[in-house]
A protein has these predicted regions:
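RNase H-like, metal-dependent nuclease domains and their acidic two-metal-ion catalytic environment used
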Residues: 1-120, 124-128, 132-226
Length: 226
């Protein structure tokens, strides 16, 4: 869905200030094959990212310190709740956990009945909205980040620019799903297309949850479903 040229335009895009609020989005992983990846956003502009492989206790401490360093309030931090992300819940009580399988979120009362026919789940909804943001060139990234090199399961010292170009392949429709709305390709299948776990791109698109939540995010229906 996202073409190579689409991402190159994002890489060269002018700074997208948005609301200017500092937020962070993360894909949780402890010591093992996958990377823990966390992005710093200012509005719709990516200002920084951190990639780590640490044990659970050390990672929690490191994330708390990084959020303070970045000036991100806990209520503006989202992370994937699935699996080991459950461990984070007790340490970040005010954060917005991203539950992949939660129901899609309606922005108005009128949308509540129809939204479930547009998207299979919350992750599919956010992935599609992120796709639109890229197509409309409404996000940007600090150019210096693109040359930073990272390693992971199946790749070694690869520039971020190349990693994101490879991982964009994870954002595609699951052709095996029924016709009921957009369903994102499952992660197992995405790994086959990408060649490794798409931790950078997944954590990138989680930021879209903030376009669906209000300040009192605990009241958003489906967001806290386990």
């Amino acid at each position: 869905m996202i073409k190579m040229a689409d991402l190159e335009e994002i890489f060269d895009n002018a700074v997208q200030v948005g609301d200017g609020v500092r937020r962070a989005s993360a894909d949780i992983a402890f010591t093992g094959g996958d990377n823990f990846v966390m992005w710093l956003w200012e509005g719709w502009h990516c200002k920084d990212l951190v990639v780590m492989r640490l044990d659970s206790q050390t990672l929690v401490s490191a994330v708390q310190a990084k959020l303070r360093e970045w000036g991100v309030e806990e209520c503006n931090f989202t992370y994937d709740l699935q699996g080991i992300g459950q461990y984070f819940k007790g340490f970040f009580a005010d954060a917005v956990p991203f539950n992949n399988q939660a129901a899609p979120v309606a922005m108005t009362h009128q949308e509540e009945k129809g939204i479930k026919f547009l998207y299979k789940d919350l992750k599919s909804q956010c992935a599609f909205l992120f796709y639109k943001m890229i197509k409309e060139k409404r996000i940007s990234i600090e150019s210096s980040l693109l040359e930073r090199k990272y390693s992971g399961d199946g790749f070694d010292k690869v520039p971020l620019r190349q990693i994101l170009q490879k991982e964009r392949k994870m954002l595609r429709r699951d052709d095996n799903s029924d016709d009921r709305g957009f369903k994102l390709l499952p992660k197992k299948m995405a790994k086959r297309y990408v060649g490794h776990s798409p931790d950078f791109f997944e954590s990138w698109l989680y930021i879209m949850i903030f376009s669906l939540t209000k300040k009192k995010h605990k009241k958003i229906k489906g967001l806290w479903m386990l």
